[in-house]
From Swiss-Prot:
Parts of the chain that traverse the membrane: 38-58, 68-88, 100-120, 129-149, 194-214, 217-237
Pfam family, one: Acyl_transf_3
Classification via PANTHER family: ACETYLTRANSFERASE, ACYL_TRANSF_3 DOMAIN-CONTAINING PROTEIN
Membrane topology: Multi-pass membrane protein
Cell compartment(s), UniProt: Cell membrane
GO terms assigned for molecular function: acyltransferase activity, transferring groups other than amino-acyl groups
Family of this protein: Belongs to the acyltransferase 3 family.
Organism: Haemophilus influenzae (strain ATCC 51907 / DSM 11121 / KW20 / Rd)
Chief place where the protein resides: membrane
Protein name: Uncharacterized protein HI_0392
GO cellular component, one term: plasma membrane
Length: 245
């Protein structure tokens, strides 16, 4: 999901920044587009899953499934899953809606981040300031990855940190930072040869990370996945720069 989050952050933030600069961005229209894009397919799939599960699941399992789907509609399923089911638990393989936690994280991110961008741009009128603010947010949220897992478990009652929004937002912010950087007027321009080398190296390093990281490695999203996110961003950046040329 980390690669998906980077791509999502890059694409959606790119659209937001373009519309903000053109004075055509509307939070209402943005949220309306998101709802129209996500909910029809989501509701259809969840209805089908619920119908099938009602026939083959025992009551307790179906009740958990129902709660997950209900909270997913409000973009809160990641918190419920954090309380009830670890991503790498054996029982997770039997949960047909396990992966919708990512929609919850995305929903929360795009509920907050566009508002930060539009308010900051109205005040400062500079994309450079948006980049700095986003970078500060990135480091603040990344720092929460260093908080003890016991704190999340004992204080926040979230034993499964895999799903936590504050540990996943940095992955989306990597993509957002790249999108904002592409809109800077004084960004660094690399030669096509350098871009090609960086693209190849980033691809190799990304696959190395994916190969080396497995279920046996202690998982802390912000720390464990930040390198794959950076390599993904480098691949997007170098290939997009070559396409522009």
């Amino acid at each position: 999901m980390d690669i998906f989050f980077v791509i999502s952050g890059f694409l959606i933030t790119g659209i937001i920044i373009t519309e903000i600069q053109q004075n055509s961005f509307s939070l209402k229209q943005f949220y309306t587009r998101r709802i129209k894009r996500i909910y029809p397919a989501f509701i259809t799939v969840m209805a089908l899953v619920s119908f099938i599960a009602s026939a083959i699941f025992i009551y307790n399992d179906f009740n958990k499934l129902r709660k997950t789907i209900e909270l997913a509609i409000a973009f809160l399923s990641n918190f419920y899953l954090g309380l009830t089911q670890g991503y790498f638990d054996l029982s997770a393989n039997e949960n047909p809606v396990l992966h919708i936690w990512s929609l919850a994280v995305e929903g929360q991110y795009y509920l907050i981040f566009p508002l930060i961008l539009i308010l900051a741009y109205k005040k400062f009128r500079e994309v450079k300031v948006l980049f700095i603010i986003t970078l500060i947010l990135f480091f603040i949220l990344l720092a929460t990855s260093f908080v003890s897992a016991n704190f999340y478990k004992e204080v926040l009652h979230q034993p499964n940190i895999y799903y936590l929004s504050n540990l996943r937002f940095p992955e989306l912010l990597v993509g957002s930072l790249l999108a904002i950087y592409h809109n800077l007027s004084n960004k660094v321009q690399l030669s096509k040869q350098v871009n090609n080398i960086l693209a190849i190296l980033s691809t190799l390093l990304l696959f190395s990370c994916l190969f080396l990281m497995n279920n046996n490695i202690a998982f802390i999203p912000g720390i464990t996945l930040i390198l794959p996110c950076i390599f993904t961003a480098l691949i997007i950046h170098t290939t997009s720069q070559n396409n522009i040329r």
